[in-house]
């Protein structure tokens, strides 16, 4: 099981020496109280550490250098308790290489109208400091996040928590390594991409391996380990033998277990956290990896089919952000076009992620009419319901583009007893026709990552961190604006 590391966020408060020691001591006291309260709220996924009260350019530059080189620091949260002249922030901000959140808050929620004087105004002037600090971030074209509101407010704490998830993903993205078993599916366009640019812009390492490398690792797997894993299945899944001979069923499931163990060992040896397969590159294998892929998805590995390394890496990135909850590789497959009930059925040949399962999956062995191999085992289930996004990344030759579509995953209106794959059904926003048109006009791929744990804003925040052109298709979308934006 892939686990997220324990990282932290530093809290840096801006002021200046003009206000005197007494005022600065009050600023420190208030800052520590805010940090302690946020940490004790139970709302944040990672701890905040009050690091310093910055009153000079040298202090700011030095703390930024430390933020950059300390591996345990995922990002920085800044707050302007008072006015902090922004020229002091230029050198440090230019050096900053990690995510930045500007918390536009104030220590006191209410203005004390009956007692307010200039001493109070000088100490509590976040409105003044926010604008000076915001200007320099805009001038430096810093893709920072701004959260506004009272620091005890539930919504403010929720926004900080959601940004933390994204910031963690941004930092961890540098360690994403994708193993490609075989090349891209022949003649498919949208799964191609510039791997060098992806490593420069997103930090992703993408390596190719012949399928024989995986087969060699599979051949090292012991029958004892295969049998032990099969026994575990009896508690985890529904073993649905169907019309199969019991021995035939068990052997075909165990072949997927052999693939799973071999794959895991290969990935662990090379520190790979995502991978791709291709049904056209299966020499030496008895089955296309199906159940094996799904089992590794459940452990946090990113995946995409047909050699689509961009989607595999994006999948792993979102699994990091969501702690591997309700997130997986998806493919737009078929439409429901009945008036007023339009929706999209997403699935894949085999490899639908079980973190998206709404119920206990069934292990099924059915023939696969593609790849020319034995009938593979796979998990079958209906997908979860709720609000989420589907996200696609494409290479336009001159640059990468990200598409984010807000969706509502829904329960299928009928059973599909003859469909031998897991599925997720969703209604795209703002409505079916405009969403599909916008997706097609913008060049969106058929492969996506579907997640019910991230919001449009979170994915958009990440895209800003990496300087990625992004098209959002949601309840605010105007189709003409999308066409105009994508026709430049």
UniProtKB/Swiss-Prot annotation:
GO MF terms, alphabetically ordered: L-arabinose isomerase activity; manganese ion binding
GO cellular component: cytosol
EC number of the protein: 5.3.1.4
GO-annotated biological processes: L-arabinose catabolic process to xylulose 5-phosphate
Enzyme type, top EC level: isomerase
Residues where Mn(2+) binds: 306, 331, 348, 447
Gene3D superfamilies xrefs: 3.40.50.10940
Entry keywords, A to Z: Arabinose catabolism, Carbohydrate metabolism, Isomerase, Manganese, Metal-binding
Disulphide bonds in the chain: none
Pathway given in the UniProt record: Carbohydrate degradation; L-arabinose degradation via L-ribulose; D-xylulose 5-phosphate from L-arabinose (bacterial route): step 1/3
Cofactor detail note: Binds 1 Mn(2+) ion per subunit.
Catalyzed reactions per annotation: beta-L-arabinopyranose = L-ribulose
Cofactor: Mn(2+)
Protein family per UniProt: Belongs to the arabinose isomerase family.
Function (record text): Catalyzes the conversion of L-arabinose to L-ribulose.
PANTHER family from the UniProt entry: L-ARABINOSE ISOMERASE (PTHR38464:SF1)
Official protein name in the record: L-arabinose isomerase 1
